[in-house]
Each structure stands twice: as C-alpha cells, then as structure tokens.
C-alpha cells in the first residue's frame, strides 16, 4: 500500500483507529502523527503483529475508508 495514501487518509482513519484497535490510546495516535512507518511499528508493539500483518491490517482499513468516502 502506498504510504502517501495512508498519510492522506490519516484524518479519516485516526477517528476510527481506536475502534479498530482498542489497545491504542490518543497519546499513541498523537505520537504516530499519521506517519505510516510509525503506525506499523505501533501495531507491532501493541499487538505483536509482524510487519507484513500490520501492513495488511492497515491496507484493509484504508480500503474501508476509501469505500466509505466514495459512498458518502
């Protein structure tokens, strides 16, 4: 997935990230600041994901956000 797409959709995703990944806090999300690599690392840290698993989860959520925007 393109890092630019993630970073461009961050504002839409940030609000839902805590619903998707309940272990994340506002401080965690502030620390990430919409940076793809930092978010991947955060998911690895909090959930024990491999890099590939974290990227796949993010890709899935970005697609969900893109679809929701298209329908709106």
Q: Could you describe each region identified by the protein language model?
A:
Residues 1-72:
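Intrinsically disordered, low-complexity, hydrophilic segments
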């Amino acid at each position: 997935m393109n890092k630019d797409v993630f970073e461009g959709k961050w504002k839409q995703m940030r609000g839902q990230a805590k619903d998707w990944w309940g272990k994340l806090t506002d401080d965690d999300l502030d620390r990430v600041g919409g940076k793809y690599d930092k978010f991947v690392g955060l998911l690895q840290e909090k959930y024990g994901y491999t890099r590939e698993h974290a990227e796949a989860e993010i890709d899935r959520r970005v697609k969900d956000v893109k679809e929701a925007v298209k329908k709106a």
